[in-house]
From Swiss-Prot:
Stretch list, region Disordered: 1-37
Signal peptide: none
Glycyl lysine isopeptide (Lys-Gly) (interchain with G-Cter in SUMO2) cross-link site: K39, K224, K226, K286, K366, K386, K393, K399
Positions where Tele-methylhistidine occurs in the chain: H245
Assembly behavior: Component of the large ribosomal subunit. Interacts with DHX33.
Protein name (Swiss-Prot/TrEMBL): Large ribosomal subunit protein uL3
Keyword Transport: no
A single MF term (Gene Ontology): 5S rRNA binding
Organism whose genome encodes this protein: Rattus norvegicus (Rat)
Biased composition (Basic residues): 18-31
Coiled coil residues, start to end: none
Subcellular location: Nucleus, Nucleolus; Cytoplasm
């Protein structure tokens, strides 16, 4: 038989070539939302860290649909988003060949976790980054120069972006080096943007000032790495029949005799995962507050709802597996997102104008699951577990030893 008697589309997309390891660990924003001067000044992106997944119960609000007013169970991802610190302002001018940086101004005080980003080995370095630059803010000549820079930015720039970094010390991670990124400022005139950014130099910006409840956002990140994989796993090609000589997880024909080369479009073994990807339209189900102290008491009930009044935090019993406890502000997104736990994710405002009913649907959570994610969790809170288990032997022994 000289040819197959049927045709089939190729396996795997060529739109994501080359399938190699990403050169950057933090997701890069390749385009920011279009600016609208009629809106108030706001940021367009934020950085967060993937903590893990859980599930929720909510009531669907979709009049006319069969599922309207019915309860549904949905998977959600928790992304921890501690406030970001603004440390710089960048002005861009539009040229025939695209945007060009015009001026960059850094803040007077920059924390060590941000300075670490400018060194390969912080321990062995002199730690002198920005020491000369920061003196500009102290003498008269430097202050005049900075004022001149700000005025020229107001005059010539069309795009204003801030430089902001994450606060690693607030997270349950070993890493001390902060992630640094430029975030575009949209809304208002250039002068208003610059004044807004200047007011917030060295200040913290919380996530609830960037995103809102029920908003659709895009998540940019690097996927979970899988290492070197064969064609069946990497391209999802069909397995060959059982009796095939020299293996069946292969491609039977890798091309014609001539041209005497293998085409780039033929599925081959190689790197799978750790690719840079942008996923659009992830709905925010909840923007949660971190732990806070009120009247001398630690308040943790950020997973309570109007229907589930139990005093519980978003953390499952034992914490999120391979992450730890979420103690800062967090965002709850519908479904899954790219990357492993602890992976830094870039959250960006949607580039599209959302008009679909599903995108504009109001989310009313009834219940957030906080059972242990390590094994078959049964209990929502520690109190519930203690009430069911009764006094344990180890507790009795500890009590006797104490007495």
């Amino acid at each position: 038989m000289s040819h197959r008697k049927f045709s089939a589309p190729r396996h795997g997309s060529l739109g994501f070539l080359p399938r190699k390891r990403s050169s950057r660990h933090r997701g890069k924003v390749k385009s920011f939302p279009k600016d609208d001067p009629s809106k108030p000044v706001h940021l367009t992106a934020f950085l967060g860290y993937k903590a893990g997944m859980t599930h929720i119960v909510r009531e669907v609000d979709r009049p006319g649909s069969k599922v309207n007013k019915k309860e549904v169970v949905e998977a959600v991802t928790i992304v921890e988003t501690p406030p970001m610190v603004v440390v710089g302002i960048v002005g861009y001018v539009e040229t025939p060949r695209g945007l060009r940086t015009f001026k960059t101004v850094f803040a007077e005080h920059i924390s060590d976790e941000c300075k670490r980003r400018f060194y390969k080995n912080w321990h062995k370095s002199k730690k002198k980054a920005f020491t000369k630059y920061c003196k500009k803010w102290q003498d008269d000549t430097g202050k005049k120069q900075l004022e001149k820079d700000f005025n020229s930015m107001k005059k010539y720039c069309q795009v204003i972006r801030i430089i902001a970094h994450t606060q690693m010390r607030l997270l349950p991670l070993r890493q001390k080096k902060a992630h640094l990124m430029e975030i575009q400022v949209n809304g208002g005139t250039v002068a208003e943007k610059l004044d807004w950014a200047r007011e917030r130099l060295e200040q913290q910006v919380p996530v609830n000032q960037v995103f809102g409840q029920d908003e659709m956002i895009d998540v940019i990140g690097v996927t979970k790495g899988k290492g070197y994989k064969g064609v069946t796993s990497r391209w999802h090609t069909k397995k060959l029949p059982r009796k095939t000589h020299r293996g069946l997880r292969k491609v039977a024909c890798i091309g014609a005799w001539h041209p005497a080369r293998v085409a780039f479009s033929v599925a081959r073994a190689g790197q799978k995962g750790y690719h840079h990807r942008t996923e659009i339209n992830k709905k925010i189900y909840k923007i949660g507050q971190g732990y806070l102290i009120k009247d001398g008491k630690l308040i943790k009930n950020n997973a309570s709802t109007d229907y589930d009044l139990s005093d519980k935090s978003i953390n499952p019993l034992g914490g999120f597996v391979h992450y730890g406890e979420v103690t800062n502000d967090f965002i709850m997104l519908k479904g899954c997102v790219v990357g492993t736990k602890k992976r830094v994710l870039t959250l960006r405002k949607s580039l599209l104008v959302q008009t679909k009913r599903r995108a504009l649907e109001k989310i009313d959570l009834k219940f957030i699951d906080t059972t242990s994610k390590f094994g078959h969790g049964r209990f929502q809170t520690m109190e519930e577990k203690k009430a069911f288990m009764g006094p344990l032997k180890k507790d009795r022994i500890a009590k006797e030893e104490g007495a």
